Amino acid sequence: MGADLVVVTGASGYIGSHVVSNLLSKGKNVRATVRDVNDPERVEHLRNLKIEETGSLEIVEMDLFDSKSVDSAMTGATDVIHTAAAVIVRSKNPQAKIVDPSVIGTKNVISAIEKSGTVERFVHTSSTAAIRPEKWENGVTLTAKTFASDATLEENPYGLAKYSAEMIVRDWHDNLEDSEKIKMITIHPCMVFGPPLSSRHLSGSLSVIMMLMRRELPLILPMQINIVD
């Protein structure tokens, strides 16, 4: 595949791990960023992934709040898939624990992309929380142009985090000069179910399955889920 290098942020997470696995199965060169390269729960399952002959895997430590480590991780990349973010929806300190990782982290990632001068494609992993307002009329169709602009730190910190990060990447991309334009895609997953690659993946969306098995939730959930196979 030549000199192409795909950087996957948040590679130890549930979505990030599956992205890395998929890329390696296609023979891609992958640089996977994790918070702690010495934590077996974060890296062991990545090291055990099958790598096709033309591919390679490099695991590096990166802190979203440390711009220098983000800059280093992006060096030489041709593609960036940004999946790193806080996945909790409630906290005693929602600004620091939920909003800041998405907002500051995303700002550092796009700054590093600009500095690299090599990135051609960027995928930003957002969420339906970014396009789902707190209130909407019955029958309305939520789209990538329907934003959670009414999300607040007190009532919906996760939605605020995802909405804010979405606005950051869109504004950044819109303001790039034509000569600097890179291809950008934002995706908006809802709840994500599938095989866990690490014990750490049993939280988040997969915790719903565990709660159903333990009969802690009704079989018919009081929520809306967009089903995509």
List each language-model region with its residue ranges.
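Structural signature of the Rossmann-like NAD(P)-dependent dehydrogenase/reductase core
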Residues: 8-9, 82, 123-126, 185-191
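NAD(P)H-binding glycine-rich loop region in Rossmannoid oxidoreductase-like domains
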Residues: 36-104
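Conserved cofactor-binding/catalytic machinery of classical short-chain dehydrogenase/reductase
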Residues: 66, 105-108, 164-165, 229
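Active-site helix of classical SDR
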Residues: 161
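NAD(P)-dependent short-chain dehydrogenase/reductase
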Residues: 176-228
